Amino acid sequence: MTSKQLISVVDDDRFFRDSMRRLMRSLGYSSEAFASAADFLASPFLFETACLIADVNMPAMTGIELYRRLVESKRAIPTILVTAYPNDDDRIRAENDGVLCYLRKPVNEQELTDCVRGAMPAA
């Protein structure tokens, strides 16, 4: 028996969080959503997460800071960052740090789907 791969969504915008969770489930993945980086880091789902979708601009800890914290703790998760305020310098830094994709909101569903599928190990 195989279980569905878990995609965690971290975004302070409830509408975006819920829509991403529904989209991931429609693609056949399991999905959990969190309102903050702290909520995700404290979650039992942290170690089950196969791919992380995180907002760049969140209070307290940004998506970039969350990714760096995961890397520093030896728990790098394939990460897709999303933002309503894209910045080339931030994108370049994030990609150089190892972030898989840096996408602009509103997110293009096909582009996001391609990024998620690229993050998943081959079956």
Locations of regions flagged by a protein language model:
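Acidic catalytic/metal-coordinating carboxylates
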Residues: 35-36, 62-66
